Amino acid sequence: MHKAPSRTTITVRIQRRRKELTLSTHSYSRCWLHLVWETLRREPMLDKRAAARASVKLAEYSQEKGIYMKINYFNAEHTHALIDLPTNLTIEQVMQLLKGSSSHWINQSHLVKGRFAWGKGYGAFSVSQSDVSKVANYIATQEEHHRKRSFAQEYEIFVSRYGLEWRNEENR
């Protein structure tokens, strides 16, 4: 939970009249998001060792940026993360930070042959507080899920649960 500093008194002049306003600067936020993004053209680029290292680095980077990340999972072709969106960042800003920093680090660390890149776009899905454990478990058991269905199949089901239209765009 994010909490801002304590109460502040602000003096404001409106049309030659002096008014004093006491504003509560306590900001409370709990905005869980299940984030999903994929490699460019959904190419399997990360082996297990590289994925494990990238996962640790992403968690560390998130903490540095004030983004609480409960769990993340890197697969050869996509990534899942469960975060609590901070009040000072938009979803787009968080995704730029996470995708940009991780691709930069993967390339700088030479974890893959050639150049690593994420595909365009991402999925950001709201998670109720009562479902946080369920989603965290879902992310933790990704390997098991992918024995049963592909990422494209999984994502199509996932997107439809949120009432969104699935566009399978392989060449992004």
PLM region descriptions:
Residues 2-172:
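Basic nucleic-acid-binding interfaces
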